[in-house]
Amino acid sequence: MHEQAIRVRPAEPADHPAIRDILRTAYRQYTRDIPPAVWGPYLTDLLDLDRHAHHGQLLVAVVDEAIVGYAAFYPDASVQGFGWPAGWAGGRGLAVDPTFRGHGVAMTLLTALEDRARAAGAVVFAFHTSAFMTTAVALYERLGYCRAPRFDVDVNAHYGVPAARPWPALAYLRRLTARPAARNAA
């Protein structure tokens, strides 16, 4: 169906409306899982692309010039305010247009994030997700990411919103090594 090549590029300000649409659409499925008192601050934070761009780089996945995915890259994950150590890189807000799910967009974005982390000299690439984001958790574990409970975050407390239900953000990380050089077929 979507057999076109996926490429990742830095986002431009003109891309922000499309990115926000993808974020709203991709995260809408979690409105029942996220405590209602926290949903508003969480979505506002995800959609604050200017702040994410100020501290990192916004990336978009593109197929035939259409934006089909997004992720924010933080060369210094400690600036995110989630307790990551200095020297680690981080990601935030990974989202894929639902019509392009299952076609490698998330994996392509993760590869681009890891490549940027290596280029920045980071020894670890880290991010948070939630247990109810089961498809994402399965992808991360399949790719070799490890749980790091020491860095889990209480999202309700992070946003300063008391909620009846707890919402832990689960920390995942991957220790980075040099990417193997491509082999030439002889």
Where are these regions (language model features)?
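Conserved N-terminal entry element of GNAT/NAT acetyltransferase domains
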Residues: 1-17, 21, 178-186
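Structural signature of beta-strand start/N-cap positions in the alpha/beta core
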Residues: 7, 57, 99, 123-124
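Acetyl-CoA-dependent GNAT
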Residues: 13-16, 21-98, 110-112, 116, ...
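C-terminal "cap" of GNAT-fold acetyltransferases
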Residues: 87, 123-126, 130-186
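Conserved glycine-rich acetyl-CoA-binding loop
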Residues: 93-111, 118-120, 131-138, 142-143
